[in-house]
């Protein structure tokens, strides 16, 4: 879809051309000024009247009425040059693509160098451009018998730049991979629970593994029973759908060492079990496998980019249902690690299945662990819906993950786990651990519980309950699943040291 070319005004013939504008006179002396001269100063008049603005996020569409060349100019406001960041540029590009989508543009061009600064170079701008295209134009296909509109696609986008074409093409490829992988995760999270069971999720993972030549294994219920995965099996007791433990292995080094373990919560629908959720809280619980989707999305990107790392992805998959066989409050279960757990809340099931998955990942070579889960409503109370909560037992690992999150624009905020928090999850009088010792510090209790299974292995817990979905349309996509943490995990794996 992307074509990279050097600028030559004599050859520029397009339905639409986007030009970036920074506040100040400098940007008007470049390409914008060139078109202003060709149009007899009319653009300057429109700028004076406020119809063309350099304020960040403002987009002005100008019909040139020229007999040849560019039919429409899109002036894209970028704000102050010194304030432009990768994330802000990505959002602006997203707004531009949503504008083109609404106008049904299928062919366009961008003067890339008008969107760059000393801190955001052409390669970064190209990455932001490609990523923003896929994120901003995403739509969940849905299940309506008749679609109101055909699927949109920008068939051709010419990127004009003076930078090295091969480098720009490489950046466009990486940005496309990030965007497409995020959209894959979005689609998984948006899929209804009756159409995405644990078996369906396992089938998806197998197809992914075959596509990218990963080693894989799907552990069935019988194997879990043999191994002693009592925590995952307990959560699955009330379901007619069999549980699955999905294991994907990407080996980017000669030796299977320094393995990064990515563990994603895969609860395909959560009723809360016998600690039943109220109706309003149960709506959208199809999204409770957002952690699994993030890990699978990251594995898709890793399969495309082939970094020199070793990655083990482990996804415990089940739903949490009610039946005569379902697990109950006051049950005591034995996890794969051998630690016993007193169940005080059947709606605190995510940490149970993650316990067995983390133990399994450690047993199969993971030396670093990152788990991703829509774990607690408490993290939303604490941090809102734009920040992912993080907990860790290792400063160095967390700092690398934090750097990746800042690079990709997926904001994370660290919450503490103290010795008193650990004492609370160890507070059961009849078992090693209590899965829900109270509402106070609820998000931290979830992380502290999972940390009991990470033990001394460097580990970061990411609670995406607030960030996995959004209720409103934005510059980078529609309401629904966000695919959060796909990009952060991918960037982390690529740059891990």
UniProtKB/Swiss-Prot annotation:
PROSITE patterns: CYTOSOL_AP (PS00631). It is found in: Cytoplasm. Mn(2+) 1 binds at residues 270, 347, 349. Its cofactor is Mn(2+). Keywords: Aminopeptidase, Cytoplasm, Hydrolase, Manganese, Metal-binding, Protease. Coiled coil: none annotated. One of its GO terms (molecular function) is metalloaminopeptidase activity. This is Probable cytosol aminopeptidase. One of its GO terms (biological process) is proteolysis. Binds 2 manganese ions per subunit. Mn(2+) 2 binds at residues 265, 270, 288, 349. Its EC number is 3.4.11.1, 3.4.11.10. The keyword Transmembrane does not apply. Pfam families: Peptidase_M17, Peptidase_M17_N. Presumably involved in the processing and regular turnover of intracellular proteins. Catalyzes the removal of unsubstituted N-terminal amino acids from various peptides. GO terms for cellular component: cytoplasm. It catalyses: Release of an N-terminal amino acid, Xaa-|-Yaa-, in which Xaa is preferably Leu, but may be other amino acids including Pro although not Arg or Lys, and Yaa may be Pro. Amino acid amides and methyl esters are also readily hydrolyzed, but rates on arylamides are exceedingly low; Release of an N-terminal amino acid, preferentially leucine, but not glutamic or aspartic acids. It comes from the Bacteria. NCBIfam families: PRK00913.1-2 (NF002073), PRK00913.1-4 (NF002074), PRK00913.3-5 (NF002083). Signal peptide: none annotated. It comes from Geobacillus thermodenitrificans (strain NG80-2). The active site is at residues 277, 351. Belongs to the peptidase M17 family.
């Amino acid at each position: 879809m992307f074509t990279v070319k050097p600028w030559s005004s004599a050859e520029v013939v397009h339905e639409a051309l986007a030009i970036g504008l920074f506040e100040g006179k400098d940007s008007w002396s470049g390409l914008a000024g060139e078109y202003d001269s060709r149009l007899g100063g009319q653009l300057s008049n429109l700028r004076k009247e406020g119809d063309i603005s350099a304020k960040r996020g403002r987009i002005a569409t100008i019909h040139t009425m020229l007999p040849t060349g560019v039919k429409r100019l899109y002036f894209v406001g970028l704000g102050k040059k010194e304030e432009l960041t990768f994330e802000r540029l990505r959002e602006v590009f997203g707004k531009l693509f949503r504008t083109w989508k609404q106008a049904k543009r299928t062919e366009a061009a961008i003067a890339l160098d008008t969107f760059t600064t000393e801190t955001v170079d052409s390669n970064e701008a190209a990455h932001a451009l490609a990523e923003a295209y896929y994120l901003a134009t995403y739509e969940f296909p849905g299940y309506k018998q008749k679609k109101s509109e055909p699927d949109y696609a920008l068939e051709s986008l010419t990127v004009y730049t003076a930078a090295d074409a091969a480098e720009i093409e490489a950046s466009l490829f990486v940005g496309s991979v990030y965007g497409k992988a995020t959209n894959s995760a979005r689609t998984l999270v948006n899929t209804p629970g009756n159409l995405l069971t644990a078996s369906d999720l396992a089938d998806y993972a197998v197809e992914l593994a075959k596509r990218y030549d990963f080693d894989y294994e799907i552990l069935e219920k019988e194997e879990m029973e043999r191994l002693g995965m009592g925590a995952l099996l307990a959560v699955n007791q009330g379901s007619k759908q069999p549980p699955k433990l999905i294991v994907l292995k990407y080996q980017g080094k000669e030796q299977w060492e320094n393995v990064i373990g990515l563990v994603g919560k895969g609860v395909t629908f959560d009723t809360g079990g016998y600690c039943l959720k109220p109706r309003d809280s149960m709506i959208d619980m199809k999204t409770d496998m957002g952690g699994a989707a993030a890990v699978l999305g990251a594995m898709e990107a890793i399969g495309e980019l082939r970094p020199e790392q070793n990655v083990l992805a482990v996804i415990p998959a089940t739903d949490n249902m009610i039946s005569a066989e379902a697990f109950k409050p006051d049950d005591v279960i034995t996890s794969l690690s051998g630690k016993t757990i007193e169940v005080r809340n059947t709606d605190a099931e995510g940490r149970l299945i993650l316990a067995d998955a983390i133990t399994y990942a450690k047993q199969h070579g993971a030396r670093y662990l990152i788990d991703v889960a829509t774990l607690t409503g408490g993290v939303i109370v604490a941090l809102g819906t734009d920040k992912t909560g993080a907990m860790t037992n290792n400063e160095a690992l967390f700092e690398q993950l934090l750097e990746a999150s800042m690079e990709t624009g997926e904001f994370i905020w660290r919450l503490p786990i103290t010795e008193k928090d650990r004492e609370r999850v160890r507070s059961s009088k009849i078992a090693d651990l209590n899965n829900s010792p109270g509402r106070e510090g609820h998000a931290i209790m979830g992380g502290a519980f999972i940390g009991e299974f990470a033990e001394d292995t460097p580990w970061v817990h990411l609670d995406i309950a607030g960030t996995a979905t959004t209720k409103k349309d934005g510059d980078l996509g529609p309401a629904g699943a966000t695919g959060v943490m796909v990009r952060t995990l991918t960037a982390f794996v690529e740059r891990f040291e």
